[in-house]
């Protein structure tokens, strides 16, 4: 019965929750921008093949360039035999380093970033 319910607790989803720990460090060169930092898994499940993507935009939000890199995470061997070093366990953090090539005449006005991952057993 509805009247017998004392309380309801929300259960965290059984998934990774990845976030940037701090704003990325950015190094500007003539032909590229290099972003580095760390991400954190605040979820309750491992994130597999985690990578960080950066997008560089001009003043009219036209995409100038983008690139991504896998994180420097934990080494895992999956049941298929594949071995990777870009998994991120719950409560762990990992570093990344992403270089985005641009022309020396590019006028970058906006930068956006995303974290992508997969989930495997």
What are the functions of these language-model segments?
Residues 1-20, 97-121:
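Terminal connector regions
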Residues 51-54, 69:
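Hydrophobic beta-strand segments
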Residues 56-67:
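Short aromatic-acidic-glycine turn motif
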């Amino acid at each position: 019965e509805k009247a017998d319910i004392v309380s309801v607790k929300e259960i965290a989803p059984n998934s990774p929750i990845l976030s940037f720990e701090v704003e990325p460090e950015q190094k500007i060169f003539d032909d590229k921008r290099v972003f580095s930092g760390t991400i954190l898994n605040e979820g309750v499940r491992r994130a597999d093949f985690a990578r960080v993507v950066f997008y560089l935009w001009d003043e009219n939000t036209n995409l100038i360039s983008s690139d991504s890199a896998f994180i420097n995470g934990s080494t895992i061997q999956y049941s298929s035999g594949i071995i990777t070093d870009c998994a991120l366990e719950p409560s762990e953090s990992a570093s990344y380093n992403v270089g985005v090539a641009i022309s020396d005449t590019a006028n970058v006005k906006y930068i956006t970033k995303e974290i992508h991952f997969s989930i495997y057993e």
